Amino acid sequence: MNTHSDFASRHIGPQGEERREMLDSLGYRTLDELIADIVPADIRMKAPLDLPAAKSETEALEELRSILRKNKLLKTFIGQGYYGTITPSVILRNVLENPGWYTAYTPYQPEIAQGRLEMLMNFQTMVSSLTGLPVANASLLDEGTAAAEAVTMCRNARPKANTFFVADTCHPQTISVIRTRAAFQGVNIIVGDCSSFDPASIGADLAGVLVQYPDTLGLICDYTDFFSRVHATGALCVVAADLMALTVIREPGAFGTDICIGNTQRFGIPMGFGGPHAAYMSCTDALKRRMPGRLIGMSIDTLGRPAYRLALQTREQHIRRDKATSNICTAQVLLAVLAAFYAVYHGQEGLKRIGTEIHLKTKSLYKVLTEAGIAIENKNFFDTLLLSVPGQADAMVQKALEAGYNIRRVDADHAAISLDETATCADIAALASALAGAETSAACDCDAPAWDPVHTRQTPFCTEKAFNSYHSETEMMRYIRRLESRDLALNEAMIPLGSCTMKLNAASEMIPITWPEANALHPFVPADQSEGIREMLSILSDRLAKITGFAAVSLQPNAGAAGEYAGLLAIRRYQKHAGEGHRNVCLIPTSAHGTNPASSAMAGLKVVPVKCDERGNIDMADLKSQAEAHKDNLSCIMVTYPSTHGVYEQTIKELCDIVHANGGQVYMDGANMNAQVGLTCPGCIGADVCHLNLHKTFAMPHGGGGPGIGPIGVAEHLVPFLPGHLTLGHEEGAVASAAWGSASIAAICWMYLSMMGPDGLREATEMAILNANYIAKKLGHLFPVLYSGNKGLVAHECILDPRQLTHDAGLTVDDIAKRLMDYGFHGPTMSFPVPGTLMVEPTESEPKKELDRFIEAMERIHAEITAIINGTADKEDNVLKNSPHTAEMVSADEWRHPYSRSEAAYPVSGLLIHKFWPYVGRVDNVYGDRNLVCTCDTVEEFSKAVEL
């Protein structure tokens, strides 16, 4: 085969002689022999994957482009939460197309993630400033999900209240997602008119209200009086606000808002046929501990210098499990970073200018249409005009279409036009001519705002230094580069995080996401305009169904945790349809990922834990006992396979049989699908539903904490209960704002499957298993492998157990992870699934040279620990407890440690050739939570505050 077209050999690390050496170290002659001893025979696939043969990178790109060219790219002014944008080229080139930004992991290790964390702090500051509320999180999945999270937040604040009011002028897709969330949580959703709704009539049972601002039909309302009446009942007020509008109209915090949610898509992010986009949430200080998602805070490092970190993590699923504020894990970090850079680049004045231009162009269109005799119902508007055209809405939409524009059909009597930053005066002239036969000059008639002065924003925003320093491209380019250099991503080193599958995100896979054919479509365009992208999505869904052995796949969920939630809802809706809606018990092994119990709680399920035995496997006797004890109410079991302990459990089919025999369904967590593809599948095993993490198994990048896609595959009987959507003709079960979720980035996985082919996919799985076993073998004599299968082998990851060593040396597992930074590595997964251990997953992409470099680092760290235990190294002042060592630390004039500077920074000779420096010393987590700062001006300003 021509090596220039053999993508699998580019994707998979070890080749030829390297593989033979690795197999020899394990005592095997062939990869097939190794796999036969690891994967249980009774779950092996009987035939190869029924997928097209692998294509070269060039062939795959050409085929995908030919499919996407079937789309029709018209200028779209539909609005309804999605708008045309202009992504500054300096951001596109240096961030979105840069693996230094898109291949990093969630910033759990802040010392090697300061660049991303600074931008997320900028994002929070931007949102807080624009909405007028003091605390903002670091992104949510989309606007609909954010609204649903706000409903939950209100209920948590008022646990005895079971009613929530949603204004009927909120975006329809948002209302659908809220209804889905409420269905199994006992929340009564009232959708109605704010002007006629009396909060006092609900009284103490009212948890909160949600309004859109401006509303979905373009009207800017003053909610001051309405919110006063809501607050009189003790309920909370939520606003879904357009951030671009907030550059010129009054901020929600000014009229009594408790929680503000929305989307940052207008800040330079393409519509993407629905996504991905970074939603936001801000709130009052009193509600900050109830907020879902990541929250970035400021703390200090060991030298007392300011440092960013993830704050208030005890709210989150990986700690609180079924008591968490949300199941959110992967969010939309990369998109939040892009939106924040957009705000940094434009600054306050630039954003105000863009917002003002959008509004004044809308006013120009208003003027010419009304002069031509078309009635427009909303007089207070920002960017959206509601045309009153009795019986003529379809005709108006068709006229616009013939002129090359999409506008929104509201109902038979109304159409709406929402302008954006891409709108030109020529567009206004063309629309006026098409809709009203009116002639207007190409120059817009721009003057004063068209809203009541009470709606005008009076307060400044984004006044912080970050938003007022980088407005030339040179400055911006260098700022981006400085921040990138502070983060360790896959373009620097292996990230061996267990359960995270940090594999290669190949350049050819990433290229299509910047094509207009993939990212420029509005999710609600007419079907004949989206034939290409829907064909691509259909092909991807079909291939994923074949890989999983299921009847159908939905791509709607925007992350793995969202997929879990969607899968559980499919089970619950199926059982309700079958007259078994009372089934509400979910069995979950104690080793499960924290999202499992959190998602179960969101789906209205009662979590019943199942024990694990001394070998880390599910205790089958306890499983059988629990299943039988709860058989009348058993809804499902959530099980990860291979297990979160890195083992192919031999009894997995028996587990499925026990649950089915007691009336339950089997939900398989697909976090470890990288050890299944091409060898076995959820359908072979007996599962009824499984979510996939496209940002793990199928080569989509993690983006530093998102975006992701968490599609769910289901067996035949669950197909009718997959997520619906307004655009699909049935909205029940919608879990995202768009029918296909983050559709544009699904192209990444389409490319991966096309270039790998069935043989490459199977080989990738086999090599992931080989790499993990190689590491386990090489390090097991120093750090015992906690769990393994019957023949002492692991799956695609292994748990190294340093607990005896750390105990004897007076260390913690954190000390090992921080010390690995000095060797140029991101630490493995800690605290999950076994506290105090290290879960290592190398993936198939890492070459033997990188595996050996990691092994060498761990061997040296073992020696460093041993030196502490035997007394040759100081128990308190040593390389582990003081790690990571920054360039500033080792170059300081004064050095008082009992070990040398070279031992601190260059413990192995390979680091002399290339060295990654942690930007800050070890971050003080306790200080950060006790002195919570989630928005800031600059590091320098915070530093002055620390000194005081």
For each predicted feature, which ranges?
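TRNA-binding/sensing appendages of the translation machinery
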Residues: Y28-D42, T257-G262, A687-C690
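Non-catalytic terminal extensions of PLP-dependent enzymes
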Residues: M1-S25, A36-F77, I86-Y102, Y108-E111, ...
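N-terminal export/assembly segments and adjacent metallocofactor-ligating motifs
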Residues: T106-R116, N122-Q124, N137-S139
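A structural preference for short, hydrophobic beta-strand core positions in alpha/beta folds
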Residues: N137, V191, V239, N378-K379, ...
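Alpha-helix N-cap recognition
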Residues: T30, D142-E143, G391, S472
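A conserved hydrophobic secondary-structure block that centers on an alpha-helix together
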Residues: M126-G144, K160, F164
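Conserved PLP-enzyme active-site core in the AAT-like
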Residues: G115, T145-A307, L369-G373, F382, ...
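Conserved phosphate/anionic-ligand binding catalytic regions in large, soluble enzymes, centered on
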Residues: I269-S282, A286-L287, A331-L335, S418, ...
